[in-house]
Amino acid sequence: MEPQTTAKVVLTTTKGPIEAELFAKEVPLACTRFLQLCKSGYYDSKPFYRVLPGELIQCGQQEAGNNTNSYPKLKDEPHTRIKLKRGYLAMASEYTENNRRVPNSATTEFFIALKEIPFSGTVIGKITGDTIYNAQDIARGELTEDGYPMYVQTVQNVEIVLGGGLVQETQKAGADAGADAESRENKSGSRDRPKKPKRKLQVNHDDDDDEEPVFTKKSVSKLVEDKFKKDNTNVAKKPKVEASAEQPEPAAVQATTTHHVQDAEDMTTEVDTVVSERLEKFRNMSRTKPDTKPKSMLISQEDRIRRRLGLGPDEDIPSDASDPSSDEDDDFDIFKHKFICPEDDKAEDSLITLGA
């Protein structure tokens, strides 16, 4: 967005007035020079000596007899938000034989653009209202073979409508801008200077009794332990407060806590004892090999014969009786023999049939 103008002048020409507003705040150096020239009457009776129809008209050429050193060259002040459009004023620069603009060469001349022109110099203002047509009338004049206007149009006088009191302010702003430019140049020049060697500052710590702290990396558990130690130290440093009647006695609390701790330890001991006993029993069981037959089944050969013949424990065994476990008497049927219960002497003989 284009900035606002802060000054205004009216150029009275032979074709009519041309009202121009200036960007005095954005381009202080060029606007200061232009306002000074207008106030001193420099542009009075100055011709528009250069006319390019449909392109531009230029004014403010210095006469050959004037001292050109009284108007030093201005530094270019291009602005990113101010472009050279139709009806805008700009400070004229010098050009080489190859038609190349010489930077930082503007002095007193200005020109009015009649169309948008690519320009990298300093644009100082713009024409307002319908007075742009008076500038176009100046460009319509006839030209000679050399390209100069046949009927020269001139600036009769210049009136400062707005910003007459800003000449001093613009001078101050221009001086500040020049100082800033010089300081920037000095800074840029100072960058090229060789750097001074750096000197290390040595400090003698012999008189200091305190040693520099040594920082070590600690684990989380170590940090927590240090924190609890610090908290316990702070608690020990706190003043003792008398216990009220409502609060329990510290001794009773300590005794209760000790009792619970003792119970827990006893319970742990009992559990360990039971577990140890069961483990020992299990180990003994695994070490002992059980008999292939129960003790009740291990009987002698005579007892087997007595049971086979149905004899009591005190009765004699017949000489022709054989062992029931041998293979000599396979036809003997144990279920057909009579068994007598020795416990019941008075009872009659009863026939017990096995497997019934």
Swiss-Prot record:
Location, primary (coarse class): cytoplasm
Record field: catalytic activity: [protein]-peptidylproline (omega=180) = [protein]-peptidylproline (omega=0)
Residue stretches making up the PPIase cyclophilin-type domain: 5-205
Keywords: Cytoplasm, Isomerase, mRNA processing, mRNA splicing, Nucleus, Rotamase, Spliceosome
EC id: 5.2.1.8
Domain of life: Eukaryota
InterPro entries referenced in this protein's UniProt entry, alphabetically: Cyclophilin-like_dom_sf (IPR029000), Cyclophilin-type_PPIase_dom (IPR002130), Cyclophilin_A-like (IPR044666)
UniProt feature, compositional bias: Basic and acidic residues: 181-192, 279-294
Annotated Basic residues bias: 193-202
Protein role: PPIases accelerate the folding of proteins. It catalyzes the cis-trans isomerization of proline imidic peptide bonds in oligopeptides. Involved in pre-mRNA splicing.
UniProt record similarity statement: Belongs to the cyclophilin-type PPIase family. CWC27 subfamily.
Protein name: Peptidyl-prolyl isomerase CWC27
Source organism of this protein record: Yarrowia lipolytica (strain CLIB 122 / E 150) (Yeast)
Lineage: Eukaryota, Fungi, Dikarya, Ascomycota, Saccharomycotina
